[in-house]
Amino acid sequence: MSLTTTQPPGPEMGPAKSDLRRGSLPHRFPAALLAATAAVVAGVLLAFSSFGFVLWGLLTAVAYVVIVVTASARVEGGRKARDRLVTTLVYGCFLLAMLPLVSVLWTVLGNGFARFDPYFLSVSMNGVLPSMDAGGAYHAIVGTLAITGLATLISVPIGVMTAVYLVEYAEGRMKRTIMFFVDVMTGIPSIVAGLFVVALWIILFGPGATNGAAGAIALAVLMIPVVVRSSEEMLRLVPQDLREASYALGVPKWRTITKVVLPTSAAGLTTGIMLAIARVIGETAPLILTAGSSAVSINWNLFDGQMMSLPVFIYSQVRMGGAVNYERAWAAALTLILVVMLLFFLARMIGRLFAPKAR
């Protein structure tokens, strides 16, 4: 009886390499290819006298994707080519998302910088005719900060405490009902909030009672659901282990919330509040109805007389027309953007200040 030993088949040594063993394109190849493609497409469009930034960008993107994917497939293999295709699409979507923001900032900066100076920020429109090359937005800046500040004082305690109730206490049908109405309030048009406050003010103070406090309440109606939803998400991110550790030490629930949960989520809560402020600081329709649109002097009293705000100031200047008024409107728009950026910077600082310190 003889035994035969069968050797296992060896690996096939074909000429084709695996995708994982293919070569790779040079590190700077994508950037160089993009620059070359953009230059070639621009030259072709200029040669046919049909150059346009939109058409140039579209053709450059299509040509770049086709060339880079084809080159990657031939040199690096199909797997790497698919990876480059998806990566290129992700970067392209990011650029498309950033394009409107950059365009808005560039347009506002280009048109508003000419009149944006200390004089514009330190004087009001009191005694200034629409055709005069004078006046500024100081009264509108004061009104914006005052109205938004009061709206924040109203909405933040209500919104944060509602979020605490939803996360720590509410259950079942009550929780679902509150969340449903919060979601409904999130989609309320701003003009509806303004009409609601106008109707309330007519009942309480009679017709024609417009002041900054009414505008603040209208903005608070818009802010509360945003604060609730953002605060709820931040409170849910607090690890349950921190709560359990506090309970194990005999700390009551209310003290656990105030000493553990809220400080731990302070940075996120601050960011959510700033998002809510950014959501309402540019509202125009409710403030026209509630705070008025004809104030030209500085008003420090939220409860007496009309109060101008930056969005309403922009609207009134554009409505009057004329080159000088348009310049004031652009400068006010730039001021509003800078105010929002400053508020976000302050929010970051406050969030870092109250965030729990690592030991």
Walk through the language-model features, giving the residues of each:
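Transmembrane alpha-helix signature in integral membrane proteins
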Residues: V54-A61, G135-V164
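Cytoplasmic-entry segments and transmembrane alpha-helices of multi-pass inner-membrane transporters
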Residues: D83-T88, I158-V197, I224-E233, K357-R359
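Membrane-cytosol interface at the C-terminal ends of specific transmembrane alpha-helices
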Residues: T152-G172, R176, A209-A248, P252-V260, ...
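Generic hydrophobic transmembrane alpha-helix motif, especially the helices
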Residues: D183-L219
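C-terminal transmembrane helix and the adjacent membrane-cytosol boundary/short C-terminal tail
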Residues: L235-R236, Q240, Y247, T271, ...
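Transmembrane alpha-helices
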Residues: K253-A291
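Interhelical loop and adjacent transmembrane-helix boundary motif
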Residues: L287-I337
